[in-house]
């Protein structure tokens, strides 16, 4: 079961990315290191509601 999720920057809080995840394989909130255009560097982006 794939669902759409939004990834938000942990430093500035801006929601930068929309992606999909499989809830069966990843039931917890996912974290990725992605580029934040507001901070102009790579930061940890966490799944939000």
Curated annotation (Swiss-Prot):
It comes from the Bacteria. PROSITE patterns: RIBOSOMAL_L33 (PS00582). Gene3D superfamilies: Ribosomal protein L33. The keyword Acyltransferase does not apply. The keyword Ribonucleoprotein applies. GO terms for biological process: translation. Keywords: Ribonucleoprotein, Ribosomal protein. GO terms for molecular function: structural constituent of ribosome. GO terms for cellular component: cytoplasm; ribonucleoprotein complex; ribosome. Belongs to the bacterial ribosomal protein bL33 family. NCBIfam families: PRK00504.1, PRK00595.1, rpmG_bact. This is Large ribosomal subunit protein bL33B. It comes from Bacillus pumilus (strain SAFR-032). The gene is rpmG2.
């Amino acid at each position: 079961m794939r669902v759409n999720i939004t990834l938000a920057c942990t430093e500035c809080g801006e929601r930068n990315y929309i992606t999909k995840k499989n809830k069966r394989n990843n039931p917890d909130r996912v974290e990725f290191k992605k580029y934040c255009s507001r901070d102009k560097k790579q930061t940890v982006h966490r799944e939000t509601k």
